[in-house]
């Protein structure tokens, strides 16, 4: 075998998955079709959950370096730092239930550089874990592993591993070659976007609906939304001529575009793999689900796929997984992906032209002025409302949810954050000094988890918690006697057999 896990795709999802695998003791090998990393901006930011996940891996400073500039750019481009639902920019971060849990505005190429450096640091300074110019063209699997035929600049080669994960985007070769069902809905709109400083752009109207479509403008960028006229071959590059024609159809203004870059074309077609695992092949990110970019949820969704899968797959391939652990990947992440497809379809419907839809948009806009409605949409788009079903009774409000970056007081009186204790990538039990029974219950698993005796600040409802490697609260206790029966069930569910 050439690796423990072959990861196909060196975008943000593939790089983070490889890093999580390596941190948990597995040997990943990343295959990327492109010879060089993409330089053009695509996604513009990551959500609170992904931001917290990367902070737990020590990447907080790298993210913060991009955040201040990103906030300024967003305010400049949209006139507001608020989030949106179907381009209704009213979701106010300051009004949310947990206003300190925020995302990071970082362009995708910058994020890829951060993650590539992180992966390199985990592989002893070597970049050999990523093979560029390697395109998967055939795939077979049996009970022992997966073998791929790869096209390279030097000809074809065969590589094998016990498991393979497709992180190769919405047109995933892995998904097609492995035979995943990919049901969904056809597109109702197409977005075209280019980066350009063409002098004629000032002749265009301001951003908004034009009667025949939508126009979106920002310094150095212009985009259109049309509700018909899909290109016959969506795989062809977006040219200046196609963009010029689209601008004319949408605005009636003919703008010469002597030079464009960063051309993107995408639709609101929404599809999701029926399962995220077929035998020894798994999917993550856009390979598992595609949808419109409304709400900026796609990259966050994919990164959290990687965070959920990495430790589970590493435990499986290294023989440390409890029974059924890998099956929980689809069980937990598929409903989250389905929920994103659901809300992006709703946003697509609200963007359609016509008086009836315009009336509905006005009503949704009015509803967003109500605090609880604003928070509902904020939870939905951020993913902070996500709660996994746990295979044992767990009644604490945090159980099954992503743990916030708690502030903790140590025995010496110092203050630390939860993320500072999670760098090892192992499960973590934090317990109050007055709940030693929690640490005693975990004693048989001490070789497989980290334990810290701390006091949680600013939360009267939380004294102790078991945190999975992906940041999910597997068990939590309030200030009363710790429920060690449920804690033991949680340890058995997620950690190697004691």
Regions found by a protein language model. Give the residues of each.
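Active-site-adjacent segment of FAD-dependent monooxygenases/related oxidoreductases
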Residues: 39-118
């Amino acid at each position: 075998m050439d690796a423990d896990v072959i990861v196909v795709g060196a975008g943000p999802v593939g790089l983070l998955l490889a890093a999580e695998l390596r941190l948990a003791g597995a040997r990943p090998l990343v295959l990327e079709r492109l010879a060089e990393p993409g330089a053009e901006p695509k996604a513009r930011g990551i959500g609170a959950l992904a931001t917290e996940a990367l902070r737990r891996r020590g990447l907080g400073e790298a993210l913060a370096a991009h955040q201040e500039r990103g906030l300024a750019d967003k305010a400049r481009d949209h006139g507001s730092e608020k989030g949106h639902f179907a381009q209704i920019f009213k979701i106010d971060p300051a009004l949310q239930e947990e206003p300190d849990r925020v995302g990071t505005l970082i362009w995708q190429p910058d994020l890829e550089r951060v993650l590539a450096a992180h992966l390199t640091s985990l592989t002893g300074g070597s970049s050999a874990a990523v093979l560029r110019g390697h395109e998967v063209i055939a795939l077979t699997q049996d009970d022992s592993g997966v073998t791929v035929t790869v096209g390279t600049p030097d000809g074809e080669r065969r590589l094998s591993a016990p498991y393979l994960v497709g992180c190769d985007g919405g047109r995933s070769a892995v998904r097609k070659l492995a035979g995943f069902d990919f049901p969904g809905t056809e597109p109702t709109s197409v977005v075209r976007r280019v980066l350009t400083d063409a002098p004629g752009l000032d002749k265009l109207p301001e951003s908004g609906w034009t009667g025949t479509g939508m126009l979106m403008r920002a310094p150095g960028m212009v985009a259109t939304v049309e509700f018909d006229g899909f290109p016959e071959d969506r795989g062809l590059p977006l040219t200046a001529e196609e963009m010029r024609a689209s601008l004319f159809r949408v605005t009636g203004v003919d703008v010469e575009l002597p030079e464009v870059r960063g051309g993107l074309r995408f639709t609101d077609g929404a599809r999701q793999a029926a399962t995220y695992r077929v035998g020894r092949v798994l999917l993550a990110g856009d390979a598992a689900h595609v949808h419109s970019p409304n709400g900026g949820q796609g990259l966050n969704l994919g990164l959290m796929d990687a965070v959920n899968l990495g430790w589970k797959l590493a435990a499986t391939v290294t023989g440390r997984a409890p029974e059924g652990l890998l099956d929980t990947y689809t069980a937990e992440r598929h409903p989250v992906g389905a929920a994103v497809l659901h809300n992006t379809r709703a946003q697509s419907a609200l963007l359609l032209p016509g008086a009836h839809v315009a009336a509905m948009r006005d009503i949704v806009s009015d509803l967003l002025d109500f605090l609880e409605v604003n928070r509902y949409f904020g939870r939905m788009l951020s993913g902070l409302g996500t709660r996994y079903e746990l295979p044992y009774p767990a009644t604490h409000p945090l159980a099954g949810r992503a743990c916030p970056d708690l502030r903790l007081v140590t025995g010496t009186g110092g203050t630390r954050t939860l993320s500072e204790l999670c760098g090892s990538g192992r499960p973590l039990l934090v317990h109050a000094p007055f709940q030693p029974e929690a640490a005693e219950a975990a004693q048989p698993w001490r070789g497989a988890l980290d334990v810290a005796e701390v006091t949680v600040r600013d939360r009267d409802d939380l004294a102790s918690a078991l945190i999975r490697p992906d940041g999910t609260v597997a068990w939590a206790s309030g200030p009363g006697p710790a429920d060690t029966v449920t804690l033991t069930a949680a340890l058995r569910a997620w950690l190697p057999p004691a």
